[in-house]
């Protein structure tokens, strides 16, 4: 029986010399690969290391001697002998390389030895695992420099004793192989890749004992920097030579191929796909170098060719050039400028050509010409330039310029484009035999909005559109109420509620008028009143409709009674309201039976002015112009135009030429009137009305602009309180840019008006600064 109490375990002391001869023999076997270690051999060597590291030394070695209490960690002598072994082994290995000649042989031998050495170092690291986990770890934690885990120690030895001597010829051989591959020769990519992997594996900081930290210093300094320099030199020489014997478009294809080849060299390095051999961190610098040499140095040539490609509509080549130049967005500036100028020129020329067919009076041709240019280059920007924002902006700028300034606007007025666009809308939305289907009409209206976006004077468009919409509504000539509402909705989305509020009120007035007609008929029935004619009205709110009051005019007695009855009805229904009749907008139908040889009757669709003249001939067959003027109280200028229309229609006849009528000229009812049609429309606008209408539009535009400018100034100053002249002008221009471009002198005049009205004042001592007066 053992006596109970404390027992002391005695540990065997292992002398390094006793185990080293067997251990070094095994290590040499690992590095020479004469035959593989058996499992039992591996475990025996591992045990030697373990026993040595765990033995208690009576005379502690190394830095362990400073510690007291408990067993000391042993390992420095073993570590030193391992380090010395590696140095000796590598020195002997280096002598074998001196006899090698030829780059490929050198690469083959170097990569073979590296892989073997790397594998052997891994095995040695496993054998010395206990040393790594204890003595090495403790030394590293205490900040001891130059101490590494055994695998890392092996790499440090390779780096210091073999790599430093061989890296230059090896790197030179690798670079030569890459150049040969660029020249179209087949190379052994795996050799290049293995060398690169060696450089990457050796890229650690020797001052950093953590093997996981990888700075790629060896790779960068000994390979990448030289590789990038060679790449730049190679492609600089090649690009100059290629461009001297090939077209620019062929060069673009060549550059595409070259960039893809370089991408393949670096793509998927970690995946070992067999095609790549450069480390992934080289991707960016390689890309930028190739782009600089292959693209940026030849931008001037590209710019010239870009214009040629635009002229020739070579969209595929344009796309290729864009995709290459766009690799660096800063290089696109000149291309965008060239595109803008090209579209501007093409648009201006297209409008100039269509003007030979009087496009100034043909809104459809004018607008379609603009749309054709926009469609062509919008498709180009979308497909060739990837809808790049900068190229979209170039398209927009160019379209804005040629739409607002071209031969049509210069020959007529700056407001001609919005006027013609409004007239084109009128063609689309007015009833005709050529009205498109709903889907096509919607597409056409969408195209209108494309052009509308570029119109600078949107207030001019609004005036003309409003006037034409008003006529469509009162004349009931709209092709579709839905289409009208759709167009107003599109304008509202683009310009806001205020822009379309009057247009929407017009629709409301037409709806209210339908109800009023029904109420008027009920009123007549309740009063037992009869109507001698079929009578209908539209009651329009004066602030929303772009019509002017009629000139003096004596309503025919046949119409006067109906007008009087409606006035009485409306006054009873809406006390205090006053109706002003727009006779120039009224129309009706007359039944005419004048032919002495047959009883055929004709229905004439006529204006109220025309009706007032024709109804005179129920009493007698001929009148002088003066007599008709006295009877109708129509202005002579207007009356003569009415008579000219009736004479051209052969309803009346005169011995005088229709273009030289005087107050004494006599006109007669043409009793032999014949026409194949039974319904004849003779309702034509008077030239004087059109002239007044045109002058009124421009007058109202200028007046409205002044009011808008003043309102903008007040809004800005109310918010800012104080503002200098330059900033106020700038903010006014910015606020109103979506409606029109105010002229600076007009803004200045509006500021003066507001000062007079005491909305603003100039600050004392700062005459260029204004303050808002609440």
Swiss-Prot record:
InterPro entries: Cullin, Cullin_CS, Cullin_homology, Cullin_homology_sf, Cullin_N, Cullin_neddylation_domain, Cullin_repeat-like_dom_sf, WH-like_DNA-bd_sf. GO terms for biological process: negative regulation of antimicrobial peptide production; negative regulation of apoptotic process; negative regulation of canonical Wnt signaling pathway; negative regulation of hippo signaling; negative regulation of insulin receptor signaling pathway; negative regulation of peptidoglycan recognition protein signaling pathway; negative regulation of phosphatidylinositol 3-kinase/protein kinase B signal transduction; negative regulation of smoothened signaling pathway. The keyword Ribonucleoprotein does not apply. It is found in: Cytoplasm. It comes from the Eukaryota. Disruption phenotype: Severe dendrite pruning defects in ddaC neurons at 16 hours after puparium formation (APF) and axon pruning defects in mushroom body gamma neurons at 24 hours APF. RNAi-mediated knockdown results in a significant increase in Akt1 protein levels and activity in ddaC somas. In the larval brain there is a large increase in the number of neuroblasts, 40% of which show a spindle misorientation at metaphase. RNAi-mediated knockdown results in apical detachment of scolopidial cells in Johnston's organ. One of its GO terms (cellular component) is SCF ubiquitin ligase complex. Keywords: Cytoplasm, Isopeptide bond, Ubl conjugation, Ubl conjugation pathway. Expressed in testis. There is a cross-link at residue 718 (Glycyl lysine isopeptide (Lys-Gly) (interchain with G-Cter in NEDD8)). Neddylated. Deneddylated via its interaction with the COP9 signalosome (CSN) complex. Residues 704-764 form the Cullin neddylation domain. GO terms for molecular function: protein-macromolecule adaptor activity; ubiquitin ligase complex scaffold activity; ubiquitin protein ligase binding. Its main location: cytoplasm. Belongs to the cullin family. Component of SCF E3 ubiquitin-protein ligase complexes consisting of Skpa, Cul1, Roc1a and an F-box protein. In larval neuroblast self renewal and asymmetric division, as well as ddaC dendrite and mushroom body axon pruning, the complex contains the F-box protein slmb (SCF-slmb). In caspase activation during sperm differentiation, the complex contains the F-box protein ntc. Interacts directly with Roc1a. Interacts with Fsn. Interacts with Dlish. Interacts with Cad99C (via the cytoplasmic domain). Interacts with Sans. Core component of multiple SCF (SKP1-CUL1-F-box protein) E3 ubiquitin-protein ligase complexes which mediate the ubiquitination of proteins involved in cell cycle progression, signal transduction and transcription. In the SCF complex, serves as a rigid scaffold that organizes the SKP1-F-box protein and RBX1 subunits. May contribute to catalysis through positioning of the substrate and the ubiquitin-conjugating enzyme. This is Cullin homolog 1.
